[in-house]
């Protein structure tokens, strides 16, 4: 009996030593992976998460971080597998559901993605990003009522962030509720004055209500912030064309030519129409 007990004790000590060594190596690999991940070296981070998981194949967070690493590199099928494994080991990880939802949407499974967004919101019902992510999915499906509901709730959670009021502005803009859209885009410019989108849409609103001076100011702001969008130049050309000055016509032609070089078919059609009307 004593011999058997001593044998069991020896076996337990050997097992404990093995587990301790595995934990030591796991932590070494995991900590190295985390440093690489923070440095945005996702390729090598993934390799160290691989090594960590060989030492501890039940560590849910390592699967999650490996999923994020391959997600960042654009390997969506592999990311999906690791998000699945994360959730199977830790079904309370709201971020895993949220990222899996985004991954599914990128893989053209929009409804599956929305179901994952639903779950992430059920786990963390006051997370701003979860609502804006689901709102964007609904927006892409043209489910504007549901999108607006999510963006409005997100905006109530945090009115200092840009994403919710911007998409709310888009929904109201395309519903031709220009007063509401304009107010939201103006709010966006105060939240982030470096984002060109709100200036662009404010320019389009002012153009639609024949306020060309303000429209020109706003589109100039958009182009100053981002000069590689053909639609910005087309919009400014349209504004110039409604002025009486021939100098403005010259600038409109210059803008249309810039947009054409960027591949804008609308600019090409506008320029052909302009000259077909007898302009020199």
Sequence positions of predicted segments:
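Terminal, low-structured helical/coil segments at or just beyond the last alpha-helical repeat
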Residues: 25, 241-242, 246-280
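Structural signature of tandem alpha-helical TPR/SEL1-like repeats
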Residues: 39-47, 72-85, 107-119, 141-153, ...
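Helix-start (N-cap) detector for alpha-helical repeat units in TPR-like alpha-solenoids
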Residues: 25-27, 60-61, 94-95, 128-129, ...
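N-terminal leader/linker segments that initiate helical-solenoid repeat arrays
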Residues: 19-65, 72, 276, 280
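Bacterial Sec-dependent N-terminal signal peptides
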Residues: 1-26
């Amino acid at each position: 009996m004593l011999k058997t007990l001593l044998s069991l004790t020896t076996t337990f000590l050997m097992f404990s030593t093995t587990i301790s060594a595995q934990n030591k190596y796991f932590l070494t690999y995991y900590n190295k992976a985390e440093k690489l991940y923070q440095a945005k070296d996702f390729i090598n981070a993934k390799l160290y998460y691989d090594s960590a998981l060989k030492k501890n194949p039940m560590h849910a967070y390592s699967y999650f971080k490996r999923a994020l690493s391959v997600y960042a590199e654009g390997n969506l099928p592999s990311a999906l597998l690791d998000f699945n494994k994360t959730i199977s080991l830790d079904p309370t990880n709201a971020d895993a559901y949220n990222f899996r939802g985004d991954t599914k949407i990128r893989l053209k499974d929009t409804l599956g993605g929305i179901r994952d967004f639903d779950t992430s919101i059920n786990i963390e019902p006051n997370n701003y990003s979860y609502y804006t992510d689901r709102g964007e999915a609904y927006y892409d499906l043209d489910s504007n009522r549901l999108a607006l509901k999510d963006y409005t709730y997100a905006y109530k959670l945090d009115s200092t962030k840009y994403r919710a009021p911007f998409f709310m502005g888009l929904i109201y803009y395309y519903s031709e509720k220009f007063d509401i859209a304009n107010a939201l885009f103006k709010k966006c410019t105060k939240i982030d004055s470096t984002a060109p989108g709100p200036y662009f849409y404010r320019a389009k609103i002012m153009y639609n209500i024949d306020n060309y001076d303000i429209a020109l100011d706003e589109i100039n702001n958009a182009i100053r912030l981002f000069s590689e969008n053909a639609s910005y130049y087309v919009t400014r050309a349209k504004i110039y064309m409604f002025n009486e000055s021939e100098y403005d016509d010259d600038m409109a032609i210059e803008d249309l030519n810039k947009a054409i070089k960027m591949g804008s078919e609308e600019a090409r059609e506008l320029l052909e129409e302009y000259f077909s009307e007898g302009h020199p």
